[in-house]
Amino acid sequence: PEPTAVPVPLQPQPVAPIFLQRPEPPKRKSNRGTGILIVLVGTVAFALLWSVAVVVVDSLLTPSNDLPKVLLDSFTQVFAGWVPIIAFFVGMVVLVQIVNRSRWWAYILGGLVVAVFVYFAFVGAYLVDAHYWERTPAEFAILLRSAWLNPFAVLAGVIAREISVWTGAWLAARGRNLDHVIELEVD
């Protein structure tokens, strides 16, 4: 006969604890990196509009036979031609770093600051181009008065204001989209 095994009673096995990891909350996405790329596009738009404005105003202020030379000199021989473009880029990058994903109103208010910064950058470049340090105080006062109401300074400020508003609208829309994505990830 074959040996029969004695059935062993089943012992209750201890239940091992199950450890669940909490899901990590979604990272707060920033608008800063992409914002700089959007500002770069805005700067190209500013440079194009600024160039057109310089061409139009220079064509009104100079005789027609001197226009090509004056236009070339406006962007290659003087600081006042290209400093507003750099000032716009720097001002908008600083604005993007500060307001990040804010709404459009923050970019509208910040655009005022950018426009004033571009205006004063042009005035400063204009004074440097005119060698203000070689002037007498009376000549400097006349030079400064002409710099404040220079049509190019006003144009630089106005164009910077408009481009900063529309670039800000683009940045705010992207920031709103990032906020919406974060809300969906939290749910």
Language-model regions, residue ranges each:
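Low-complexity segments enriched in small/polar residues
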Residues: 19-187
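Acidic/Ser-Thr/Pro-Gly-rich, low-complexity N-terminal segments
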Residues: 1-23
